[in-house]
Swiss-Prot record:
InterPro entries: NAC-dom, NAC_dom_sf. Residues 9-159 form the NAC domain. Residues 108-165 bind DNA. The keyword rRNA-binding does not apply. SUPFAM superfamilies: NAC domain. The lineage of its organism: Eukaryota, Viridiplantae, Streptophyta, Embryophyta, Tracheophyta. It is a single-pass membrane protein. Interacts with calmodulin (CaM). Interacts with SNI1. Residues 175-196 have a biased composition (Polar residues). Disruption phenotype: No visible phenotype under normal growth conditions. Mutant plants display enhanced resistance to the bacterial pathogen P.syringae pv. tomato DC3000. One of its GO terms (biological process) is regulation of defense response. This is Protein NTM1-like 9. Pfam families: NAM.
Amino acid sequence: MGAVSMESLPLGFRFRPTDEELVNHYLRLKINGRHSDVRVIPDIDVCKWEPWDLPALSVIKTDDPEWFFFCPRDRKYPNGHRSNRATDSGYWKATGKDRSIKSKKTLIGMKKTLVFYRGRAPKGERTNWIMHEYRPTLKDLDGTSPGQSPYVLCRLFHKPDDRVNGVKSDEAAFTASNKYSPDDTSSDLVQETPSSDAAVEKPSDYSGGCGYAHSNSTADGTMIEAPEENLWLSCDLEDQKAPLPCMDSIYAGDFSYDEIGFQFQDGTSEPDVSLTELLEEVFNNPDDFSCEESISRENPAVSPNGIFSSAKMLQSAAPEDAFFNDFMAFTDTDAEMAQLQYGSEGGASGWPSDTNSYYSDLVQQEQMINHNTENNLTEGRGIKIRARQPQNRQSTGLINQGIAPRRIRLQLQSNSEVKEREEVNEGHTVIPEAKEAAAKYSEKSGSLVKPQIKLRARGTIGQVKGERFADDEVQVQSRKRRGGKRWKVVATVMVAVMVGVGMGIWRTLVSS
């Protein structure tokens, strides 16, 4: 048949049969002699042509880098099954493992991948020409029945030499060759979907706040997501004197610790706003909270400058600082509060005087964290960041030390000390029953062995060890006895031998 031009077909038509269709339809008809039904695939001996000459012999003219051909089986040996795949310029080399082709869970064929090499083996140069060879495995398609001819179907590819978007050419070629369904083929023209120019309005609930908007709107209506860590620092810290919500306190009392003689900065003993009430109000209505409103939440009984120093721990900071301060301030608080005991007179405490050094270490760590946070945050977004001022605590001795958490160290006995005590408590006890049994055994055996049995007790486990000790004199005597017995035996044997020899000589003389 004549060549079929792709221009005569509507745009989007492709000749891409699946592996099952190539074997179960095209190869079956070709092997059974129905050549007119599969004339869309030409009959070419690919081993007599170079791979770059084969695209011109294809019936279907297409711009896609793949072509189909029927090829008669050319045996390399008359009685063998190996195919002759050598051409004038090179050879086809099989690579990889043969893949099975199934139709409804039934094996109908195999697919072999071959690569063309220039020159002769083993010094051939690999090229970008690849071929898939399809062969049937069914008994009725072996080509030996009457009217059948042995054929294989070859699918030729050519890989691009350049890289496409950083992807290797091998992967691009195999990816393109595996698109069989119409859904995998897309048009070359891709139209962009027009984006909406409508600006997204900020919810009214966030008006009046300073740092709770989750995105910023630009002039063209594009929404820019604000980083989560910037939400904590999106308001001015200079005018903020009231504490922002932080992690929930684990102390039973709120802010008033007047039962232990705690004094506020303004000299009054009135407690500030309750921490529980403050957190409940903030977390229940987070949208209504703002930096301006936080100042008005103070207790009227306390002056603006009369916020106690303990509340400064709840100042606005980055999430890392808030977590670090809360962790350092409230670690092991349950165990520590159970052990705290305050004096009845003047709020005296029995803690050591190195509390100020503990606070100075905390202040230094806090300054280091603030410095790192300032270096990591980007500038130029209208966010004013101010480092937190260190809390200067005056040394008031042991009388008024505030509510700072202390750390109690519990001393545990090490394993070495326990072992030493066990070794000291170890005793060697002689068991009378074992001693009598050993004495009876020595009397029966007649040996001069001195039995000595010791009991080594460790805790509740006792180990009885029997040890037999003998003096040096006893050992020497026993050795002498054994040596005398040996000589007696040797002498007796020699006498018997001599007597026997003499009797033999006498009998010989008598008989003669």
